[in-house]
Amino acid sequence: TMTSLASCEEAENANWNFCLELPDPDVEFNHNTVKNSQFLQPLFEFSGACAGCGETPYIKLVTQLYGDRMMIANATGCSSIYGGSAPTVPYSVNKKGFGPAWANSLFEDNAEFGFGMNLATTQRRAKLADTVEKLIAVEYCDADLKAAGKEWLDNMDDAEGSRKAADKLIAELNASVDPDLTGTPYEKDWLANGKKCVCEACTLGREVLANKDLLVKKSQWIFGGDGWAYDIGYGGLDHVLAQDQDVNVLVLDTEVYSNTGGQASKATPTGPIAKFAAAGKRTGKKDLGMMAMSYGYVYVAKVCMGADKNQLMKAITEAEAYKGPSLIIAYAPCINHGINMGKSQEEAKKAVEAGYWPLYRYNPDLAKEGKNPFTLDSKPAKTDYKDFIMGEVRYASLKKLFPAVADQLFDRAEKEAENKYEYYKKLSELDSVSYTHLRAHETRSNL
C-alpha cells in the first residue's frame, strides 16, 4: 500500500547511506566478463530517460568498464538530453573522484568534436611525456623518482599499466618536489619564491603534477543515435573513421529520430510507419557497418544486449583495446517502436532470433594474424520474421491501414534480411586471402 514519504524517508536514507559506505571488492579479477563487470561501480545512474530505454544500459556498461578514465563527446539527441540536462546529470564519480568527462557540441559535428578532444589529449600527453623525460634526465633527480618516471614512460599507452605507474610517479613527486630548505644555502631564494624550490628538477616536477590528470591513458568515446550517425552527422563520422586516431564510437540505433518524435532516418528499415514515412518506409536500411568495414582498418561490431551479452562484452572490450578507430552499432528498442517497454530487452532478443538484427564483429587485428577479420556471431533465424515485426506497432499499424502495401513491403523486408544474413555468412566463411580479394574487388566495383 502507498505510504507517505515522511514516514519512511529517514529509514530509507539510512539504508541508502549504508549502501554508499560499502567497500568495493578489494581483489584483482578480470573485469571483462558479463558477471564480473557488474561488480564495478556504474558511473552513469538515475537518468531521466524513458522507462525501459534501450540506450541507457549500453552507456551504463561502458562507464562501468572505463568510466574513471573516459572522455565522451555526445551528439545532440536522446542521449544528450538524459545525459546532460540541468539541474542534474547522470554521470557520476567514484570514491576517488574520478568519472567520465562529458561534453555536448552540436548534432552535426559530434564526431569532429570527439576527434578534436582526442587530438588535444594526445598532444598534451606527448608534451607531458617530454617533461617527464627531461625530469628523469636531471643528474641530481632522486633515484626512486627516476625509476617511477621511466616506468610511466614505458606504460603510458597501456590503460592499467599507466594507472599503476601514475600512482607511483605522483607519490614520488609529492615526496620530492619542493622540499623544506630551511637552514640550507638555498633558504633565502626558497622563501622569496613562496617556499618553492627553483631548481630544474622541482620546476619540471611541478609541471608534471599540474598535469597529473593526463598520466592515466584516456578512453575517448563518441556517443550518438542513428539520426546523427546515419544521417546528419554521417559526413563527419566518416571523416573521423577514416583517420588513424584511437577513438571509440557507440551508435545507439533506435532506427528513428527518437528525441524529436520518431521521424524516419536512414537507419529505418523497409516497412515500418514513421514520421516522413506515414505509408511505410519504401527503402532499406543503410548498412553503416559494412561502409565502415570498407576501410579495412576500422574495428566494427553490431551488438544487441538483450540477445547476447557475451558478444556485447567481447565487442566493447575489443573495440576499446583496438589501436585505431572503432564503431559499435547497438540495437536499442525505443518507445517509438510501439512495444511494451517493460520488456525491451526481451524484444531485442526477439529481433536477433528472427534475423532482424544480425550480430557480428570485424577486427582488423585478426587480418594481421592471417585470419578472417569478420566473425558472424548470430545464428540463422529460428523464429518467423513477420511474426516479430507484427509485434511492434510501427509495423502492425501499416498492416491495419494499408494491408496490400504492408504485405508487399514486409515480403521485401524479410527477403532483404535473409539476403543480408547470407552475405554475412559468406564473408565469415572466407579465409583471410579470399576476404582481402573480395573487399578489393568490391572497392574497385564502386569506383
Predicted regions: what is each one?
Residues 1-35, 98:
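Non-heme iron-sulfur electron-transfer modules
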Residues 5-16, 87-89, 95-139, 355:
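Flexible beta->alpha loop and helix N-cap segments adjacent to enzyme active/binding sites
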Residues 20-23, 27, 82-83, 199-326, ...:
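Thiamine diphosphate
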Residues 34-49, 104-119, 126-142, 214-216, ...:
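Conserved thiamine diphosphate
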Residues 48-76:
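N-terminal amphipathic, basic-rich helices that act as targeting or association modules
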Residues 87-101, 312-405, 412, 425:
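Glycine/aspartate-rich loop-and-adjacent alpha/beta segment that forms the canonical ThDP
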Residues 109-198:
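N-terminal leader/propeptide and maturation segments of large enzyme subunits in energy/redox metabolism
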Residues 436-443:
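Conserved small/polar residues in nucleotide/adenosyl-binding loops
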